[in-house]
């Protein structure tokens, strides 16, 4: 089966290509009775939208969402919700020079080997443009989780390339284009990105996502554990090369006496588990960390081959994010929310 749908009860099927007429998704399984209009979804899409600062792609897409079905008089009906986002600023001619070559680090090679052909325009189906419908679906999940369980999902950037970003305040996160929780470091980030653009290169990032106010009990052992599903969908995001939960890889250097979160009558002491034990939520915040690789489309020439196997030099022109991690925070939030609503509904179905 093709891998375009996620979820068991709250299912999201994503469709479209970067330079096609439109992209979108169908959300099947949303409970009826949720007050919902386009503005609820648009607010999240605007956080991810391209062209909002000099540090991201200058492709100018309004990303205006259209609700085609599943909502009547401002309320979800329980039937499939179809969401459409039209592409209005595609420049396919920018990709004519790489239509027959494979960009190092990109999915050009693997899509061709799997399907026997590929759409080279903007990366086609493998483009990060396809995360917009994910954010749209995630907006619905966020709203339902907040209204029915008081769950809050939010994220921030904790590292840009070699620059670590110490956490200071959630209030700083929406006040800068990096989603950095530290206003004092923003000038350094801007200077770094300005030089990176002059170099024609790209860089990676680290994103943290936190879900608060979850009840204990969500998750379906053994194979649909909450943390397993989180890791699964996060690795489905463009450019994600690593996922850790709680202490993550830091647990390697910890002893059991340190890693295991002690329990008192007042609750857990620490959260090395990242809010999940045995694949089931503990009631503590669920904490997820993502490693985002550097963007593959850069102006620096690199060696590759064309579809005939002949050696070529590749240089990617056009408009690209020099750090895709800058816009990854709302995308990662959406993915976490989609996993959580699915598990909330599954828990309710089995355990009441």
From Swiss-Prot:
Homotetramer. This reaction introduces a second double bond into the aromatic ring system. Its EC number is 4.2.3.5. NADP(+) binds at residues 48, 54. Belongs to the chorismate synthase family. This is Chorismate synthase. One of its GO terms (cellular component) is cytosol. Pathway: Metabolic intermediate biosynthesis; chorismate biosynthesis; chorismate from D-erythrose 4-phosphate and phosphoenolpyruvate: step 7/7. The keyword Flavoprotein applies. FMN binds at residues 125-127, 238-239, 278, 293-297, 319. The gene is aroC. Pfam families: Chorismate_synt (PF01264). Reduced FMN (FMNH(2)). One of its GO terms (molecular function) is chorismate synthase activity. GO terms for biological process: amino acid biosynthetic process; aromatic amino acid family biosynthetic process; chorismate biosynthetic process. It catalyses: 5-O-(1-carboxyvinyl)-3-phosphoshikimate = chorismate + phosphate. Its cofactor is FMNH2. Keywords: Amino-acid biosynthesis, Aromatic amino acid biosynthesis, FAD, Flavoprotein, FMN, Lyase, NADP. Coiled coil: none annotated. InterPro entries: Chorismate_synth, Chorismate_synth_AroC_sf, Chorismate_synthase_CS.
